[in-house]
């Protein structure tokens, strides 16, 4: 009975699952997913991820070039400049690809675990076949000449060679290899194919008669090539001969040899390529192309290997592409110019074009019909490393004030460049940016320094591994932001340096080291706020607020977050200016601006804490709500005025990962999200419904922006690629309709009453939201977690800005900000429906509509059923509110650019076809109507000498080389004869031969049976995970490509295993603790480069209290490029009067009992990174502080010692009297209350947990008697510094390190540096009042900081203390001291401090240990620097000078130590104590000996 019931239940369940309703639901779900992915299409890819010749291919019939870009295959037509795309649905990176001989199909290999070999229909761009027989990545693939078979070779830990009959979907032959394989090539007659790799040339033979009859996998027969003298080489690429040389096989070695093998697998001859390294090869019947280092491509004759010519090299690294407007400048490089390496080649036999990819991620297509006259058909330059941020150039009301053409956007990258792009109007640039002939999409490259090494992808084969390993991984630009008026570009790098560029001249107008760590977010305030502020947020948990209207003077520094700050935004809500910030401490702070003197101060009004890390934030255009992307993949929406959470919905379709970025569109209808699973999604902001999904990036998407015309979404990623997505016509029309209705409402409000000109002009430039077509209102109780999830503090009421314009607006009651207070989901649906259905009043109200919305709304609704591209032909392109349609007469001639004459309908229509032909990816039938604004940017330049679109160099510029330099060599007699015994020897099985493998039932020896291989080959990894931990089986495997993780996930021939895709994930993980991953093994790397503010963290390590907040100041940072001082390597030599352990930059001024005035000046970052000699000192352990400072302004900058200078001051101090009235005096001992400067909720929770487990006990102690902590040199080095960017989401967030409790202080000044480089200063925070507690003793006597120690050295904070009233002096008091006053670094006095010159200066054991640790760190840094500069094959003049300087220093140190042998080392401040002197001397002698040995070994190797 029971059995019967069970069977009945089972049958019922089966029937239920088979029911039509279930199938219908499944089909609907599948259709739903398909609809979501079809809403947004990939229109253009700006980037390339080709890692070798296997990632580039050409259709021999049509000339179509295919290359990999993340998870996308780009099919590019060089003649038409058109792109089509194949998206890999598995979300795995494309590593190898090849065309079929007829060009109809494309085969791709991918990386990751259990990769697939896929065959795609090129015309349909759809998958037709799939093979999953590899486990650890596919290294290379190839079609047979008959297109019947496909051969695929796995990566190092896969070791499988498969021959696949892809139409039958069976593997006909297979075998294993014991070496890393880098390339594969089929013979012309399809009888064999050849693989090349590390000490590996292998010929694999196919018996078509046998393989066609057997349906099971048969052993693949292989024979090794006889390498002879070249047996220890790495063969990077191989190609079988064609035509008369079909029996030959050509390959190249990484050492720069071109080799030819005969049909007997015998090394016949070779020729040197005269290059340092060779990467790729392409063979035709007429030519052999060899891609080499420094952009070199050599041409040889395949019949005899005679040298023919060398192709022109591409652009030199660091080239200003905006200046390359003529063909004569294209091929002209400087004497010391450096070029990228050629890493991939493919030849188009139809057009005789050669496509090349270089390791700076640039693509060139050369016309090689005549080798003596090579022309450039096409070129493009892309980012070579992780792209961190993207910003869209704003719409400017007055087009004549615009610095960039419409539809431009800006990106920044780890390659240390900021790039300006314009894909819409290629060739139509601004007055200062003429069209260039290097790239159709790239307008300008801003190089932040002269380090060209950062421009190369060092993880590619073309990268120099030695140089790449010594490169600081923290270089690069992390964030960018454009001012609302389009005039300034702010950028923050990964070292904490803030730069401001003028976009009109593209010159650097300001450079200041604002933070101790990377700047994660920059934000300008919108014009509607009535303020011109710039907020800078960093990993060092500080926010600096600068006044852009007052030459970027520092207004305030906010110190409320307890961990990295991930986002900061401005908003105008309820007549108040707000600042919202969120961070990895799970806190959200809402602040309100308050007028203070001549500046603005932000005070906290709400503080909300959630249970998950907050990674990004955006404010919707109504400025009433802010959306925050969280670690749990939810989007939380908060009311800006109240700080209450109003809504929560899922921000990702997947079940893994975390939200990294969120971005609202200009109308506020949609919000786009980026998840760490590499997917993009677009949601309806009001309902939370997903409306579109996208994929294609192979790394985390680090930035997104909607275009101003609502047609595109631009995404940037860690894979170095930029994707331009085309939104569906329905989405675009709905967004444009909302913007049109908003402008009409604003126009109606302006007619009812006067408005402040400042606010009114700002409202015109900013898109405010309107009602969406549908969607419920947000409910305040929709959060599943509830409001009790976090704590909320309402400490201060909202404080209005008491400016005149604000008072007028509040009095009139007609401010546009009042309209913004209505969010688009809170407007009446009935009213919205009436406006949508009856747009006639919209079109007839007020003056005639102009600009982008010249078309009435009813016409938009009719056109909504058409393709969006057809709408473009009927309406002007929406460039900005000031744009006029063709029916509007243009402005007067005085307002025009270089064109001068007015643009009529006829003239624009005549110019439209010419513009269209220069636009890539535009449909050929579209006629782009030029608006008046576009006419401003049109440049009637003389065309470059182009023949059929090909740029040819002048004859003198064509590089030539003597053919006698390339001598063909053959093996010596008998050297191969002994190895090649004839026919008998040829029958001997090679180590990789299938005969050495025991097959059972004609099946391949699988990785599950590794012992079946009789030879000692490297076993396969069978655990299903990346085998990075496996030890290589052979000694030469140290060249494996999977040893490191690249910045963008690009490995030299290595797969993208899950372990190797962790770079960006790890970056975001460490946002919570502000430390770098790695541990002690990477201490040296972390301490090599520190920001200047890190040094002054040592000055506050003994401070028991934080100082109260100070008001704003008028310090103007007005540095120009000609005033920016650069410091050479010679300026790093310390002064002879510097006491032991004191870096040169911490020298005190002379002992003058009177008060001193100082001159803060701008301190620039040195491009050569030679300020690392005190890196170990910068990492000194710090004492826990007993208070947390919540806000601090510029007046808390520590006054620096006066220095002689011949340059004018870059900082001027003004208007400080009224803002410092409440400051305590310098010598005062009273303690002021800290108002709201208490622990944050998040920090208090962490503090309680730390105390409970015994961590950071100093934070819980009373501030009156902090206990001194002994610091060992090893602890100093182990402290965290700057961080990589890593994200391991499941891990709990660690407690905040002690180092993050200190506020960054002003950077120090080197005495000898300032003498040579002029005045220097930095932007930071410091203490301006003295402490009232003892630093070393346990007594309670109130003393100043300088009295705390018996020997306050120059590196101690006491030595840098100045009274606050000194800052109140006028500019006339800020004069540099004479050199006589700074002679004695020991003599120093401060107000309230009596320091005797004859005081006993005892050198304790602790100070001795500290000195030894610093000495060891300095020596280590010097050795590392010496290795770095001597590793360059062609050092520059500066590097040679550095080398000589270091050698001389080493020699002088050795001589001094020899002279002092047996003597006691003395201290400049007095005789040392008996304890520790002998140990110090012994350590010095031992370490000096080790240093000399290392230098000698290095010199011997170099010689």
From Swiss-Prot:
Pfam families hit by this protein? WD40_MABP1-WDR62_1st (PF24780), WD40_MABP1-WDR62_2nd (PF24782), WDR62-MABP1_CC (PF24795)
Alphabetical list of InterPro entries matching this protein: MABP1, WD40/YVTN_repeat-like_dom_sf, WD40_MABP1-WDR62_1st, WD40_MABP1-WDR62_2nd, WD40_repeat_dom_sf, WD40_rpt, WDR62-MABP1_CC
Coarse class of the primary localization is cytoplasm
Q: Where is the composition biased (Acidic residues)?
A: 784-796, 1028-1043
Q: What this chain does, per the record? A: Negative regulator of NOD2 function. It down-regulates NOD2-induced processes such as activation of NF-kappa-B signaling, IL8 secretion and antibacterial response. Involved in JNK signaling pathway.
The record describes its quaternary structure and partners as: Can form homodimers (via C-terminus). Interacts (via C-terminus) with WDR62 (via C-terminus). Interacts with MAPK9. Interacts (via N-terminus) with NOD2; the interaction is enhanced in presence of muramyl dipeptide (MDP). Interacts with MAPK10.
What is the protein named? Mitogen-activated protein kinase-binding protein 1
């Amino acid at each position: 009975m029971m059995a019967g019931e069970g069977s009945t239940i089972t049958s019922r369940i089966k029937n239920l699952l088979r029911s039509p309703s279930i199938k219908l639901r499944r089909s609907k779900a599948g259709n739903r997913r398909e609809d979501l992915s079809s809403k947004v299409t990939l229109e253009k890819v700006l980037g390339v991820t080709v890692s070798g010749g296997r990632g580039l291919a050409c259709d021999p019939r049509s000339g179509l070039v295919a290359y990999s870009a993340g998870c996308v295959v780009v099919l590019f037509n060089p003649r038409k400049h058109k792109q089509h795309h194949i998206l890999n649905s598995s979300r795995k990176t494309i590593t190898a690809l090849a065309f079929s001989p007829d060009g109809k199909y494309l085969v791709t290999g991918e990386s990751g675990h259990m990769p697939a070999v896929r065959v795609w229909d090129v015309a349909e761009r759809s998958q037709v076949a799939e093979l999953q027989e590899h486990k650890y990545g596919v290294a290379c693939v190839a079609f047979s000449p008959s297109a019947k078979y496909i051969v695929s070779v796995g990566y190092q830990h896969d070791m499988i060679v498969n021959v696949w009959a892809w139409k039958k979907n069976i593997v006909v032959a297979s075998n294993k290899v014991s070496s890393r394989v880098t390339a594969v090539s089929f013979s012309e007659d399809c009888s064999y194919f050849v693989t090349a790799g590390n000490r590996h040339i292998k010929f694999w033979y196919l018996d078509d008669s046998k393989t066609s009859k057997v349906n099971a996998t048969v052993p693949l027969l292989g024979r090794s090539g006889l390498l002879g003298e070249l047996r220890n080489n790495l063969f990077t690429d191989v190609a079988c001969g064609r035509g008369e040389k079909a029996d030959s096989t050509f390959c190249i070695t990484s050492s720069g040899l071109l080799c030819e093998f005969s049909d007997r697998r015998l090394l016949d001859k070779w020729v040197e390529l005269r290059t340092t390294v060779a990467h790729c090869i392409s063979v035709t019947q007429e030519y052999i192309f060899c891609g080499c280092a420094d952009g070199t491509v050599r041409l040889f004759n395949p019949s005899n290997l005679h040298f023919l010519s060398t192709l022109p090299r591409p652009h030199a690294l660091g080239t200003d592409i905006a200046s390359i407007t003529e063909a004569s400048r294209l091929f002209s490089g400087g004497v010391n110019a450096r070029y990228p390496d050629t890493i991939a080649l493919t030849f188009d036999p139809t057009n005789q074009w050669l496509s090349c990819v270089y390791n700076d991620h640039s693509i060139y297509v050369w016309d090689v019909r005549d080798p003596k006259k090579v022309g450039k058909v096409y070129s493009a330059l892309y980012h070579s490393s992780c792209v961190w941020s993207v910003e869209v150039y704003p719409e400017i009301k007055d087009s004549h004030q615009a610095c960039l053409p419409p539809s431009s956007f800006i990106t920044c990258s780890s390659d240390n460049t900021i790039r300006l792009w314009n894909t819409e109007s290629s060739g139509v640039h601004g007055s200062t940016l003429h069209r260039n002939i290097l790239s159709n999409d790239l307008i300008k490259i801003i190089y932040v320094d002269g380090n060209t090494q950062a421009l190369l992808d060092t993880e590619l084969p073309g990268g120099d591994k030695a140089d790449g390993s010594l490169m600081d991984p923290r270089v690069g630009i992390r964030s960018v932001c454009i001012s609302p008026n389009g005039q300034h570009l702010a950028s923050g790098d990964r070292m904490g340096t803030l730069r401001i560029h003028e976009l009109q001249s593209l010159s650097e107008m300001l450079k200041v080291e604002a933070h101790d760590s990377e700047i994660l977010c920059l934000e300008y305030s919108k014009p509607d706020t009535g303020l011109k502020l710039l907020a800078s947020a960093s990993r060092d948990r500080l926010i600096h607020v600068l006044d852009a209207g007052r030459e970027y003077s520092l207004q305030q520094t906010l110190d409320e977050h307890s961990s990295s700050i991930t986002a900061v935004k401005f908003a105008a809500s309820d007549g108040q200016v707000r600042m919202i910030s969120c961070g990895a401490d799970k806190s959200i702070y809402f602040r309100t601006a308050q007028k203070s003197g001549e500046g603005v101060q932000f005070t906290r009004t709400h503080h909300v804490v959630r249970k998950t890390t907050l990674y990004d934030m955006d404010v919707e255009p109504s400025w009433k709500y802010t959306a925050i992307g969280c670690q749990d993949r939810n989007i939380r929406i908060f009311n800006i005025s109240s700080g209450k959470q109003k809504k929560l919905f899922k921000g990702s379709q997947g079940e893994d990962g975390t939200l990294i970025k969120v971005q609202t569109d200009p109308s506020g209808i949609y919000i786009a999200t980026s998840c760490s699973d590499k997917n993009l999604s677009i949601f309806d902001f009001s309902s939370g419904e997903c409306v579109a999904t996208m994929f294609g990036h192979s790394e985390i998407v680090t930035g997104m922006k909607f275009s101003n015309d609502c047609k595109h979404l631009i995404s940037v990623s860690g894979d170095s690629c930029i994707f331009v997505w085309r939104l569906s016509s329905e989405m675009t029309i709905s967004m444009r309709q909302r913007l049109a209705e908003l402008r009409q409402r604003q126009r109606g409000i302006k007619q009812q009453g006067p408005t402040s000109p400042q606010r009114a002009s700002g409202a015109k430039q900013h898109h405010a939201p309107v009602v969406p077509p549908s969607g419920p209102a947000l409910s305040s109780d929709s959060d599943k977690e509830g409001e009790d999830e976090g704590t909320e503090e309402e400490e201060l009421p909202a404080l209005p800005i008491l400016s005149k314009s604000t008072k007028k607006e509040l009095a009139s009651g007609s401010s546009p900000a009042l309209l913004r207070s209505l969010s688009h989901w809170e407007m009446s649906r009935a009213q919205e429906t009436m406006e949508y259905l009856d747009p006639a009043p919209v079109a007839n109200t007020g003056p005639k509509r102009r600009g982008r919305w010249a078309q009435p709304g009813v016409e938009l609704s009719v056109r909504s059923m058409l393709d969006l591209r057809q709408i473009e032909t009927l309406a002007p392109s929406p460039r900005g509110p000031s744009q006029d349609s063709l029916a509007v007469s243009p402005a007067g001639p005085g307002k025009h650019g270089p064109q001068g004459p007015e643009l009529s309908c006829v003239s624009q229509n005549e110019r439209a076809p010419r513009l269209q032909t220069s636009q890539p990816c535009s449909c050929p039938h579209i006629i782009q109507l030029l608006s008046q604004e576009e006419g401003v940017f049109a440049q009637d330049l003389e065309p470059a000498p182009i023949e059929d679109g090909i740029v040819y160099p002048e004859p003198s510029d064509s590089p030539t080389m003597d053919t006698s330099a390339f001598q063909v060599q053959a093996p010596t007699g008998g050297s191969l004869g002994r190895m090649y015994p004839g026919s008998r020897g040829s029958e001997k099985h090679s180590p990789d031969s299938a005969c050495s493998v025991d097959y059972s039932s004609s099946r391949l020896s699988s990785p599950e049976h590794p012992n079946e291989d009789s030879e000692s080959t490297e076993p396969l990894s069978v655990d299903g995970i990346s085998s990075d931990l496996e030890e290589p089986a052979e000694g030469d495997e140290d060249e494996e490509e999977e040893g490191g993780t690249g910045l963008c996930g690009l490995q030299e021939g290595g797969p993208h295993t899950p372990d190797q895709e962790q770079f960006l994930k790890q970056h975001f993980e460490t946002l919570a603790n502000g430390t770098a991953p790695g541990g002690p093994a990477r201490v040296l790397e972390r301490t090599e480069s520190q920001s200047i503010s890190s040094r002054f963290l040592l000055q506050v390590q003994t401070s028991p209290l934080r100082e109260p907040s100070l008001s704003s100041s008028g310090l103007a940072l007005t540095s120009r490029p000609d005033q920016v001082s650069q410091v050479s390597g010679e300026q790093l030599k310390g002064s002879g009067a510097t006491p032991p352990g004191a870096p040169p930059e911490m020298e005190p001024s002379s002992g003058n009992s009177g008060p001193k005035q100082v001159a803060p000046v701008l301190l620039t970052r040195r491009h050569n990174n030679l300020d690392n000699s005190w890196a170990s000192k910068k990492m000194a352990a710090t004492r826990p502080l007993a208070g947390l400072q919540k806000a601090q302004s510029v007046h808390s900058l520590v006054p620096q010692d006066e220095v002689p200078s011949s340059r004018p001051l870059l900082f001027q101090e003004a208007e400080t009297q009224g803002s410092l009235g409440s400051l305590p005096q310098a010598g005062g001992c009273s303690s002021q209350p800290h108002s709201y400067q208490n622990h944050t909720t998040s920090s208090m929770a962490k503090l309680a947990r730390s105390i409970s487990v015994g961590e950071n006990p100093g934070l819980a102690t009373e501030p009156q008697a902090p206990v001194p902590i002994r610091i060992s040199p090893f602890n100093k080095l182990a402290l965290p510094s700057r961080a990589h960017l890593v994200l391991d989401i499941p891990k709990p967030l660690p407690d905040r390190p002690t180092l993050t409790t200190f506020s960054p202080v002003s950077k120090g000044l080197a005495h000898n540096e300032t003498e040579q480089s002029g005045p220097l200063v930095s932007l930071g925070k410091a203490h301006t009042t003295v402490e009232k507690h003892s630093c070393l003793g346990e007594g309670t006597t109130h003393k100043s900081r300088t009295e705390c120690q018996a020997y306050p050295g120059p590196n101690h904070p006491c030595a840098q203390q100045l009274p606050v009233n000194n800052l109140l002096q006028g500019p006339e008091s800020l004069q540099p001291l004479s050199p006589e006053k700074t002679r004695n670094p020991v003599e120093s006095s401060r107000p309230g401090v009596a320091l005797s010159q004859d005081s006993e200066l005892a050198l304790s054991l602790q100070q001795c240990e500290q000195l030894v640790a610093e000495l060891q760190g300095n020596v280590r840094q010097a050795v590392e620097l010496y290795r770095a500069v001597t590793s360059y094959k062609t050092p520059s003049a500066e590097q040679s000078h550095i080398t000589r300087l270091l050698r001389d220093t080493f020699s002088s140190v050795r001589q001094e130590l020899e002279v002092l042998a047996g003597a006691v080392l003395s201290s400049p401040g007095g005789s040392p104590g008996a304890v520790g002197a002998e140990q110090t001397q012994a350590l010095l002698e031992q370490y000096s000996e080790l240093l000399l040995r290392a230098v000698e070994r290095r010199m011997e190797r170099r010689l």
